[in-house]
Amino acid sequence: MRMKQGVSRRRMLALSAAAGSLAICREAAAQAEKRIERLDPALDAIISTSEPIVDLATNLGGTANVEGPLWWSEGGYLLFRGTDLARWKYVPGQGISVFKQNTNAANGITRDPQGRLVACEAATRRVTREERDGSITVLASSFQGRRLNFPNDIVVKSDGAIYFTDPWTGPAAVQPPGENDQIFAGVYRISPDLGTLTLLVNDFLVPNGIAFSPDERVLYINDTARRHIRAFDVAPNGTLARQTDRVFADLSGPEPGAPDGMKVDSAGNVFCGGAGGIYILDPKGKKLGRIVHGYQNTSNIAFAGDDWKTVYFCTRTSLGTFKVKIAGVPVPAVKKS
């Protein structure tokens, strides 16, 4: 009996050691998939190739992509859309909790110059603003008598003008457009006084991520279907100088992943998902590096932290982070002089 007990203990120890070794091997394999690729020496001023890429939450399940991250600087937490379409909150060092259950499947969110939350609501096909008392103000729901398609991502200029993408996807793509639906995918501007909705461009296949250069003179918009980012100079009246339309960067490749949400740092470098990970591009569109996080897609990105040098990224079912050396453009945007 003693011998059997002794063998049992040894076997348990051996199995425990084997399980531990297997876990370590799996973790090492997963970490081996994560790397920072230097495509140009200029990357070193932005991020170290030895910078850890950290998973904060994985295998979140659900039917929707993890999306729409936004750092709430006053509270020191990250808001983002969870896989159940609710708005979740991540507090560094504490974890994830549900922040708001019913958001009408809001995707891209940001803040206006007064600090109020502005959202693209997919389920209701509108752009809204949440007031201080929690009430909702509808900022845009139709254009020229036809409903918006599927407001997706959004950015607010420092003068209060709101720019958003409206791809022909989601609920609007389930069936052919009716007489009250748009017949194109558009990019729009809501005037600072909220009185005018202007169609800026309508020749994208799937307009998605949208971001300004730090001086707000250039607007970047990516086209997920074409796998590239386009850039436009911003005219004095806030519309786009169409003659300046150019392909800023092609992010296609053999690996999974396409341009989706994107953000810009204070030096003008663009962070955007693409084939194989997150690309870092200089202000001229040159590829400086790629963050390979080991997931098939990057749905969105946000700068965060007290110094805006923490980057959070969302994938299909995960949330991750890494640090950079150059601060991102703060949200809300600061009025340009």
PLM segments and residue spans:
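N-terminal secretory signal peptides and thylakoid transit peptides that target proteins
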Residues: 2-20
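Blade-level signature of beta-propeller repeat domains, shared across WD40, Kelch, NHL, RCC1
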Residues: 304-337
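Short loop/turn segments immediately following beta-strands, especially the blade-tip
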Residues: 232-240, 324-329
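Beta-rich, blade/repeat-based domains predominating
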Residues: 59-77, 102-121, 126, 144-162, ...
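A short beta-strand motif characteristic of beta-propeller blades
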Residues: 54-58, 96-100, 137-143, 196-201, ...
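Short, conserved, GDST-rich strand-edge loop motifs in beta-rich repeat architectures
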Residues: 165-182
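A short loop-to-beta-strand structural motif that recurs across blades of beta-propeller domains
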Residues: 86-88, 126-128, 186-188, 228-230, ...
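Blade/loop signatures of beta-propeller domains
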Residues: 31-52
